[in-house]
Amino acid sequence: MPDYLVVLESAWTIRDADSVDDAISIAISEAGKRLNPTAKFVEVEAGILSCPYCEEELPCTLIVARTALVGVKMEMKVYKADSEEHARRIALSTIGKALRDIPLEIIEVEEL
């Protein structure tokens, strides 16, 4: 039974954000707080986008009227899964229970 690395993307809404860095810090902190009791083994970091014109890496954050939408990337290692699909379901179930109302999408599954 192989091990897998499952990478998920989530969207966090942050109110009263003063800057992009502030919004990212708050989103990562909130994700960590929610994941800590049940899924503290999940790696959380800020999402990154590539500019289609200059290919420069940019933070995955948008602020309008002091409300930010922050893309957060989460990585979870799933051990001894039956298949890639099984690893996806395990990761979604584990992280989804901790982040009940946060939208999640799997962006990559890699066999270790």
Curated annotation (Swiss-Prot):
Q: What is this protein called?
A: UPF0212 protein Mhun_0078
Origin: domain of life: Archaea
Q: Which NCBIfam families match?
A: PRK03922.1 (NF003035)
The taxonomy runs: Archaea, Methanobacteriati, Methanobacteriota, Stenosarchaea group, Methanomicrobia
Q: Which family does it belong to?
A: Belongs to the UPF0212 family.
* One Pfam family here: DUF555
